[in-house]
Regions:
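Alpha/beta catalytic cores of group-transfer enzymes, especially the acyltransferase/condensing modules
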Residues: 143-192
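ATP-binding N-lobe of GHMP and related small-molecule kinases
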Residues: 6-121, 133-143, 174
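Short, conserved phosphate/pyrophosphate- and ester-handling motifs at nucleotide-, phospho-/glycolipid
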Residues: 124
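Charged, glycine/proline-rich intrinsically disordered loops and linkers
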Residues: 64-69, 187-195
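Short, small-residue-biased leader/transition segments that mark boundaries at the very start
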Residues: 1-5
Length: 195
């Protein structure tokens, strides 16, 4: 099926208070989305797809599918957060009966400098959210923001293993947020039960 393209930006974050306390469930933080963005563009492709980011080289890394799984044509993979977001979003899409397709995904960022040095504005969280949101548009999944947050949080935790996901919330919802994290142990138990 023909897919439309998607192009969107999500903001980075800045913790105002509670950056360390919020790692524990029930402890709040105040977070603000900043006017620095990550942009993800997705364009339909035919035989294989690609992922490209100026932070890791201007050359795209090609990918294909094997047994329904996305497989990169590259030994060193700098796109862990993007791939985790793709895998979980596409799993959601398949559960909704959506046929998967190939596409070229391009990332540009204002959250790192030109040398790839991070400013601490939540670039890994922002690229995870931007990927989920772009695929939501590309596949026309009609996810609400809470579903986008949940998928992005699970993808981020799959790569990082810990963290409050406050950066995910800021990139997902924007503006000023009072945020408390969820019980990661409960989520881990549920994931183990369902797999």
């Amino acid at each position: 099926p023909t897919r439309r393209s998607s192009d969107l930006s999500v903001p980075g974050k800045l913790f105002i208070a509670g950056e360390y306390a919020v790692v524990e469930p029930g402890h709040p933080a105040i977070i603000v989305a900043v006017d620095q963005f990550i942009n993800v563009t997705i364009e339909g492709a035919r035989k294989n797809g690609s992922i490209q980011s100026a932070q890791y080289s201007d050359l795209p890394i090609r990918w294909t599918r094997r047994n329904g799984e996305l497989v990169l044509d590259h030994r060193e993979n700098p796109f862990h957060y993007i791939l985790a977001a793709i895998r979980l979003t596409e799993k959601y899409a398949q559960e909704k009966g959506t046929l998967l397709s190939f596409y070229d995904l391009k990332v540009t960022s204002e959250l790192d400098n030109s040398n790839g040095r991070k400013y601490g504005l939540g670039s890994s969280g922002a690229v995870t959210v931007a990927t989920v949101k772009a695929l939501n548009l590309y596949y026309d999944l009609k996810m609400d923001r809470l579903t986008q947050f949940k998928i992005a949080a699970l993808a981020h935790l799959a790569v990082q293993g810990n963290g409050s996901c406050g950066d995910i919330a800021a990139s997902c919802y924007g503006g000023w947020l009072a945020f408390s994290t969820f019980d990661h142990e409960w989520v881990l138990r549920k994931q183990q039960e369902w797999t």
